[in-house]
Design a protein with these regions (language model features):
Chain B
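Thiotemplate assembly-line natural product biosynthesis machinery
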Residues: 1-23, 76-80
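Phosphopantetheine carrier-protein modules
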Residues: 17-37, 54-61, 65
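Catalytic nucleophile serine of serine hydrolases
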Residues: 40
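Short active-site alpha-helical segment characteristic of glycosyltransferases
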Residues: 46
């Protein structure tokens, strides 16, 4: 039978994308989970995976074309009526993507994810900023060898290949925070964030809780562990937080899932999204898939790769659509606590402030201890403050005992 | 390795980790964090790159000595041959 491959919605705040490159041509066999097309969005270039096996019959949308979410990108010949694959619940969009026309988004199994990896290895990886600079300088990115992470093409690579002289030192000093294209991408991303957050504040009755907790033991455990392993195996404190949130979502229902059409549905697996700040403005929150099942070293490596790809503009559609809850850590910004906004259709978001020495009462005496303020914003349509308090306390307990994470 | 050579190499490592940073805009005396929001993940990636490139293992306790390009050059010049 003939099947339509549509541009999936990538979370609540994306309603269009520009097809940049097809990795397949008519006649090619494709397997579920394979990255078949690269789409440029406000969140950077996104690798979009196909959600069923088949043979490509027709490419409908040519590279360079901007289309709304839900548009048929290609048609493929498939075997029997597709048996229900493991799908992430299709995110509800605010734009034209809303409704039955939206393709389901795939949650890849580790095996198929590898197939996509191979498919995407053949073409250049490039950050959005570098892509814009390449366009400005008329540089063909296909001809460049990248020097960035995973062979990614950096601005420097583009400039070396381009004819234009570099900006002068004086000019450079003024614009230290501005890189080429960052403004353009940040503008689109700002609009997307504005749409999603406005919708959240309009529709979701948030309640907020915060809890400060002594994490001295965890900080010491982490320092001792990191001193005894090679640099490549060091953990960040955030990895402990991510795992603690994931395990607590297994313990308590009502925080890891989706609220759609007046109904809450718990996500079968916990996919913790991690808020990643993009230099030049904006943020994305891609998911670490099946977070609760991952041992800390695996989780850390996935987290590291995810942040790197988020900043290089190399995320996958499934990673953007999957988060069932988000963790946002503003510890780097040295604030005490975060009071975050839920990203619909999710129903909860956990915040973390900076870890640092604070006066703390231990056995009736005030002592300097390493303390972190954890916070929770949750959807009152799904849970109440009492359950939220238990959930937050469980996260705090789990972070405080990292050897059990 | 000459000081200039080391500085150039370090700069390319930094912009490799942060591909959205234009190397021409990096000011050697100002902390990476203050210039382009270099965070703990970037610092970890930088330490990993230093290990790959030079075989130097920078302990976590000494991360503050990698805070700016000038500090990196001062810290690494006698460690890198």
């Amino acid at each position: 039978m003939l099947s339509e491959f549509r541009l999936p919605a990538l979370g609540a705040d994306m309603d269009e994308g520009t097809v940049v490159q097809w990795n397949v041509a008519p006649g090619d066999a494709v397997t579920r989970g394979q990255v078949v097309v690269v789409v440029e969005t406000d969140k950077g270039a996104i690798d979009v995976e196909i959600f069923e096996d088949g043979v490509v019959r027709e490419i409908v949308v040519a590279p360079g074309t901007k289309v709304p979410v839900g548009t048929v990108l290609a048609r493929l010949e498939t075997q029997a009526p597709s048996t229900a694959p493991t799908l992430a619940p299709a995110p509800v969009g605010t734009g034209p993507g809303e409704g039955p026309g939206v393709s389901p988004v795939l949650v890849p199994e580790s095996g198929v994810e590898r197939a996509g990896e191979r498919a995407s290895a053949a073409r250049p990886r490039i950050s959005p900023a570098a892509r814009v600079r390449a366009r400005e300088l008329g540089v063909d990115v296909g001809s460049l060898a990248g020097s960035g992470p995973g062979g990614a093409i950096t601005i420097e690579d583009v400039q070396k290949a381009g004819p234009a002289p570099r900006p002068s030192r004086d000019k450079a000093g003024e614009g230290a925070r501005e890189s080429a294209g960052a403004g353009e991408r940040a503008g689109g991303m700002r609009e997307a964030i504005a749409a999603a957050m406005s919708r959240s504040k309009r529709e979701i009755p948030h309640y907020y809780l915060s809890l400060s907790t002594d994490v001295t033991a965890a900080v010491e455990w982490l320092a001792a562990r990191n001193a005894s392993v090679p640099v490549t195996e060091r953990l960040l404190f955030a990895a402990l937080l991510i795992k603690a949130v994931a395990l607590s979502c297994v313990d308590f229902k009502g925080f890891s899932g989706f609220y759609r059409e007046g109904r809450y549905e718990e996500s079968p697996l916990v996919h913790v999204g991690v808020a990643v700040a993009i230099r030049g403005g904006g943020l994305v929150a891609p998911a670490i898939m099946d977070t609760a099942q991952k041992p800390l070293p695996v989780l850390m490596e996935d987290f590291r790769q995810l942040v790197t790809r988020a900043r290089a503009g190399r995320l996958r559609a499934s990673e953007l659509a999957a988060p069932s809850i988000i963790l946002t850590s503003l510890g780097e910004a040295a604030v005490d606590a975060v009071f975050p906004i839920i990203q619909p259709p999710q129903v909860a978001i956990v915040g973390a402030g900076a870890v640092g020495p604070r006066p703390w009462v231990v056995d009736g005496r005030v002592e300097p201890r390493q303390v972190i303020a954890l916070s929770l914003a949750a959807d009152h349509r799904v849970t109440d403050g009492r359950l939220g308090a238990q959930f937050l306390a469980r996260i705090a307990e789990r972070v405080a005992a990292p050897d059990r994470l | 390795m000459k000081r200039e050579e080391l500085a150039a190499k370090l700069l390319s490592l930094v912009t490799g980790i942060a591909p959205d940073v234009d190397p021409a805009t990096v000011i050697p005396g100002i902390n990476f964090r203050d210039q382009f929001d270099f965070d703990s993940m970037d610092t970890l990636n930088f330490a990993i790159e230093l290990h790959r490139e030079f075989g130097v293992e920078v302990p976590e306790a000494e991360y503050s000595r990698l805070a700016s390009l000038d500090k990196c050059v001062a810290y690494l010049s006698d460690k890198v041959r």
